[in-house]
Amino acid sequence: MKKIFRLLFCCMTVIAVTTACDDNPIDEDGLLITDRDECYVSNFDLTGTDHLTVKIGDAIIDNEACTINITVASGTDLQHLYPKFSLVTDAKLEPKITGITDFSDLANPRRYTVISGSRRVRKTYTIYITVQKPV
């Protein structure tokens, strides 16, 4: 009886492994490539080294023009910020955010590319930062 269960388990495992990998391939980052062509940013935030937001109000995201306008508090250290993106399902971001990012060069705004789940659609977003004037 144990022999039958082991054989059945082995057969089920082989079937599961061989059929599971055929539907959606995996990209170079280990993420599934899907059929989704949607490609947009749904939310954006900047946090300081204390992981608290530095933005004033909501970020204005224009998914047609591919721009993000955000106002940060006066005195914010623009050289040490963590950008936080919320993307549509299955999309990914380039370059990858690996830690603190320098946003201090306001004349040359940072750009990030959102890539759809299908990897067929790419949109490059420009982040414009305005520093709130001191009161």
Residue ranges, per PLM feature:
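Alpha-helical transmembrane segments
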Residues: 11-15
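Bacterial N-terminal signal peptides that target proteins for export
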Residues: 1-8
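Beta-rich interaction/scaffold domains
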Residues: 21-135
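C-terminal motif of bacterial Sec signal peptides marking the signal peptidase cleavage site
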Residues: 16-20
